[in-house]
Regions:
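Intrinsically disordered, low-complexity terminal regulatory regions
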Residues: 2-71
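Fold-independent oxyanion-binding glycine-rich loops
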Residues: 6, 35, 102-103, 124
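A broad, low-specificity signal marking well-ordered, structured residues that form hydrophobic/aromatic
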Residues: 30, 122, 134
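Juxtadomain coupling helices with adjacent low-complexity linkers
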Residues: 39-51, 84-89, 133-166
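Structured interaction and signal-relay segments at domain junctions
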Residues: 49-113
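Short glycine-/small-residue motifs
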Residues: 71, 132-133
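A short, aliphatic-rich beta-strand micro-motif
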Residues: 118-125
Length: 166
């Protein structure tokens, strides 16, 4: 059994039950690395995000529980490898789909330090576990997503979840 101090758990956002890789380096130091199942699908997720972005005309993000692992669309470089926001983490913990409303009353900023908001955010579930989310970033015009956009995000999340199960 390995006990990780609370300060390190907070800084690295390590939650109870999070998978960790534990190994030693050449100097004999013990190294803990967070394991991301969604990160394993990164090249595949990037292709899926690209196709989805072209279909809906929005920037699309695929996130694990900590960061954006794949992005496609106009602003992809602004989002890639960035840490997700606490609001998106909370939404994922609730296993709910977020849909932007007209007038922007329920804004969700998916990524820290980027002032853009999600049109749709759908959780990725694999074997009943929360593993990440698919987000469509609202266009600058602030247009609300169509029913088709919402379904596309939900289907993408379900498909990526199934890929993780196999």
């Amino acid at each position: 059994r390995v006990v990780i101090p609370k300060e390190i758990r907070r800084t690295m956002r390590i939650r109870e039950g999070d998978p960790l890789e534990i190994f030693t380096d050449n100097d004999g130091e013990v190294v803990f690395k967070k394991y991301s199942p969604v990160g394993e699908l990164s090249p595949f997720a990037a292709q899926y995000a690209d196709v989805l972005s072209r279909a809906c005309g929005m920037t699309v993000l695929v996130c694990d529980r900590d960061r954006v692992v794949a992005a496609a669309g106009n602003c992809r470089k602004d989002f890639l490898e960035r840490r997700i926001s606490g609001a998106l983490e909370d939404l994922m913990d609730k296993r709910q789909t977020h849909v932007a409303q007209p007038g922007g009353q329920n804004r969700l900023q998916p990524v820290e330090a980027v002032e853009r908001y999600a049109a749709v955010a759908a959780p990725i579930l694999a074997n009943g576990d929360m593993t990440g989310a698919v987000c469509m970033v609202q266009p600058e015009t602030g247009a609300v997503p169509s029913d088709g956009d919402i379904k596309l995000a939900q289907v993408a999340a379900a498909f990526l979840g199934k890929q993780l199960e196999e």
